[in-house]
Amino acid sequence: MQLEKMITEGSNAASAEIDRVSTLEMCRIINDEDKTVPLAVERVLPDIAAAIDVIHAQVSGGGRLIYLGAGTSGRLGILDASECPPTYGVKPGLVVGLIAGGEYAIQHAVEGAEDSREGGVNDLKNIGLTAQDVVVGIAASGRTPYVIAGLEYAHQLGCRTVGISCNPGSAVSTTAEFAITPVVGAEVVTGSSRMKAGTAQKLVLNMLSTGLMIKSGKVFGNLMVDVVATNEKLHVRQVNIVKNATGCSAEQAETALIACKRNCKTAIVMVLKNLDADEAKKCLDQHGGFIRKALEKE
């Protein structure tokens, strides 16, 4: 696909005079364009749902969710992956973010990194990619060699693959088994795909990881019941989670959390089923960590 023919490289008529307007009008133009992004994502919800189901199936079988991208796309993958352990209590290696150019590229531009097909393959080899894993290639343009080569390598190993781009019919879309293509149109600043395209990618990644965690029993109602209390704010959140899930007092919630070494799931089952910490943990373990299943047990 030629660069000048890509939607993400097109000229946006709405912002053609943005350098001549007031600061407030500038913000309005950007905001008006941003409003279109959730609608673009809405149009690909069935594709996102299909990807979530595949990711959940693979992760349930011992696989990992691996994001692969360059520049903004790679940074968004790393951001999403890094939030999963504290939010959902999963091991750091379960959701992995890889970026062309390595760790240095998180904060700096690495010239030519996205053009390295070898880099995409080697980065996946270095984390021991297996057929159980799911590789999600992220590229707004859909033409990034680093990502395309990584998806091709993953396919050769038998991995399930997902491609996220913002240009229909792109190489990323056609290389991946599952294509998610929110078409957000031309950017306010021509070609600056960190803007609308990046926002769309972030919304999609939010859904992929959150959907995986919900289907894995990491959410009860809408509560993040596997949150790890790494600071005072999260200690308070744990108490509130147990309170909201059970209707108990803050004191009862804190007592239960202390007894079970601050595991919200265990504390909730303790309170609702009147069990001690060991009994509640055993009950949860017998039901795969799903609170609802544990509560349904007679």
Swiss-Prot record:
<feature type="active site">
    <location>
        <position position="114"/>
    </location>
</feature>
<keyword id="KW-0456">Lyase</keyword>
<dbReference type="InterPro" id="IPR005486">
    <property type="entry name" value="Glucokinase_regulatory_CS"/>
</dbReference>
<dbReference type="GO" id="GO:0097173">
    <property type="term" value="P:N-acetylmuramic acid catabolic process"/>
</dbReference>
<feature type="domain" description="SIS">
    <location>
        <begin position="55"/>
        <end position="218"/>
    </location>
</feature>
<dbReference type="InterPro" id="IPR005488">
    <property type="entry name" value="Etherase_MurQ"/>
</dbReference>
<comment type="function">
    <text>Specifically catalyzes the cleavage of the D-lactyl ether substituent of MurNAc 6-phosphate, producing GlcNAc 6-phosphate and D-lactate. Together with AnmK, is also required for the utilization of anhydro-N-acetylmuramic acid (anhMurNAc) either imported from the medium or derived from its own cell wall murein, and thus plays a role in cell wall recycling.</text>
</comment>
<comment type="subunit">
    <text>Homodimer.</text>
</comment>
<dbReference type="InterPro" id="IPR046348">
    <property type="entry name" value="SIS_dom_sf"/>
</dbReference>
<feature type="active site" description="Proton donor">
    <location>
        <position position="83"/>
    </location>
</feature>
<dbReference type="GO" id="GO:0097367">
    <property type="term" value="F:carbohydrate derivative binding"/>
</dbReference>
<dbReference type="InterPro" id="IPR040190">
    <property type="entry name" value="MURQ/GCKR"/>
</dbReference>
<comment type="pathway">
    <text>Amino-sugar metabolism; 1,6-anhydro-N-acetylmuramate degradation.</text>
</comment>
<dbReference type="Pfam" id="PF22645">
    <property type="entry name" value="GKRP_SIS_N"/>
</dbReference>
<comment type="similarity">
    <text>Belongs to the GCKR-like family. MurNAc-6-P etherase subfamily.</text>
</comment>
<dbReference type="GO" id="GO:0016803">
    <property type="term" value="F:ether hydrolase activity"/>
</dbReference>
<keyword id="KW-0119">Carbohydrate metabolism</keyword>
<dbReference type="GO" id="GO:0009254">
    <property type="term" value="P:peptidoglycan turnover"/>
</dbReference>
<protein>
    <recommendedName>
        <fullName>N-acetylmuramic acid 6-phosphate etherase</fullName>
        <ecNumber>4.2.1.126</ecNumber>
    </recommendedName>
</protein>
<comment type="pathway">
    <text>Amino-sugar metabolism; N-acetylmuramate degradation.</text>
</comment>
<dbReference type="GO" id="GO:0016835">
    <property type="term" value="F:carbon-oxygen lyase activity"/>
</dbReference>
<dbReference type="GO" id="GO:0097175">
    <property type="term" value="P:1,6-anhydro-N-acetyl-beta-muramic acid catabolic process"/>
</dbReference>
<dbReference type="Pfam" id="PF20741">
    <property type="entry name" value="GKRP-like_C"/>
</dbReference>
<dbReference type="InterPro" id="IPR001347">
    <property type="entry name" value="SIS_dom"/>
</dbReference>
<dbReference type="GO" id="GO:0046348">
    <property type="term" value="P:amino sugar catabolic process"/>
</dbReference>
